[in-house]
């Protein structure tokens, strides 16, 4: 299925896309040594010494571009599973690097500021949860951005939702002390699911947990844990914190993604929170 994102023009991810040479296929050695597949993604950037942030589900790349332009001192890795969206986002970044017109600008209200080099942005076509689990070394990521992820509303698809025990365990592992998982969604059922997990993984000294939502999501989470059990933390590795709007967001926005702008026009409600690594 094609979404026609290129509007008849071939999409060219170019050097923005992480290549197979940079991320070779995992060898069979990971069956006996899980660390054998680890690769430091900081090496994929022009300045590997900068802090690293990861966006899960970059879509058309709007947040990634805006945030990277606002924070040139930080490296950003966008991960997108849908190939056409991955190619489209990488192509947008490549064109802005080259000073070419951004074909999305007029429709998604992306800042009309002069294009910057954006050498601090790379795109990866992968399953983000699996990439973080098998590839990312301990303690190297400052922020994981998770905005408007697929809610997978059917019960048989709940296992595909990003927030799970395994994901939260791996996020805690790869984040630096004080690092963050930043979450925004418009989907009430997904928020209930997420909140039920947050209750078990994050301390809540400020009363930020949506306890009503967590109670609604508890049955689905309990069923998921019975079917695919994963060890629970002995000590909660996160602390819940309020969500502060992103620097590149427009007036009244939280992060400024394409989905957020679309859903705001539709009058939808939003939920947001930060999990900070203790």
Language model: regions and residue ranges:
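Conserved beta-strand signature within the Rossmann-like core of class I S-adenosyl-L-methionine
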Residues: 177-185
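Conserved glycine-rich SAM-binding loop
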Residues: 59
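S-adenosyl-L-methionine
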Residues: 1-54, 62-71, 93-138
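Conserved SAM/SAH-binding beta-strand->alpha-helix loop
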Residues: 82
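Class I S-adenosyl-L-methionine
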Residues: 190, 196, 201-278
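Conserved SAM-binding loop
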Residues: 89
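A short glycine-rich, Lys/Arg-flanked "PGG" loop and its adjoining helix->strand segment in the class I
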Residues: 163-177
